Regions:
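Helix-turn-helix
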Residues: 30-64, 68
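Short hydrophobic clusters on alpha-helical segments that form packing/core surfaces
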Residues: 23-31, 104, 171
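Generic hydrophobic, amphipathic alpha-helix propensity
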Residues: 19-28, 44, 65, 69-77, ...
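Hydrophobic alpha-helical connector segments
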Residues: 68, 82-110, 167
Length: 211
């Protein structure tokens, strides 16, 4: 009997996860085609083929689901970066961070809809939530991996969370026009500049002990 109860709870949890995922997917389609302002909760539940009451079991309003979507999509970016990076060895901390930045940039270049959505909505509070809580174990693992990189480098920084935020925000703000409109330069040129700027960010945030 106990086994049946456990199985039933498991099935209910999976059902809830699927409904939440369906709501997120429907919302993403609408937000990226109509915009957040012009999308109503009625639009979302119609797209997801659910009753309006079901929406409120998971989210308070459309801004709550927008925040959940940003957390999810940004988390997926970091998940891919982690999967591609965590087994690789690099000559320096700078080289590692530059390569991780390139992985994130390449994802945004491949999915311009995602670029537009994240560029308009990513904020420090949500970024912090993605890194520390993670939409899934892998996105949180990115921050654990990054923290370990800092620790094993033997270098100290004022705030290593702020360092990665500054780098991601730099990518977010500079890539938008370059990827979508190839202005003021093309992506290869922008990458070259970012490769120069990332070490500068690391140096300015580093605590250098005086001998």
């Amino acid at each position: 009997m106990a086994g049946k109860d456990v199985n039933e709870v498991g099935r209910l949890d999976e059902k809830k996860k699927k409904k939440r995922e369906d709501l997120l997917n429907a919302t993403y389609e609408l937000f990226t085609s109509k915009g957040v302002f012009d999308t109503s909760i009625s639009d979302i539940v119609k797209k997801a083929n659910m009753a309006k009451g079901t929406f409120y079991l998971y989210f308070k309003d459309k801004y709550d689901i927008r925040n959940a979507l940003i957390t999810k999509k940004a988390g997926e970016l970091f998940s891919v970066a982690y999967e591609k990076m965590y087994r690789k060895k690099f000559s320096s901390l700078e080289a590692t961070v530059i390569c991780a930045a390139d992985v994130i940039i390449d994802q945004l270049n491949e999915d311009k809809t995602l670029l537009e959505f994240i560029a308009k909505n990513l904020q420090w509070g949500l970024f912090h939530k993605v890194l520390l809580e993670g939409e899934n174990d892998v996105s949180k693992s990115f921050f654990d991996w990054y923290s370990e990189l800092i620790a094993t480098s033997g270098r100290k920084f004022k705030n290593h969370e702020l360092v990665i935020y500054m780098i991601v925000d730099l990518i977010n703000s500079t890539c938008y026009n370059v990827i979508l409109h190839e202005e003021p330069v093309g992506l290869p040129e922008l990458k070259e500049e970012l490769h120069q700027l990332i070490p500068v960010i690391l140096r300015t945030q580093e605590i250098v002990e005086k001998s």
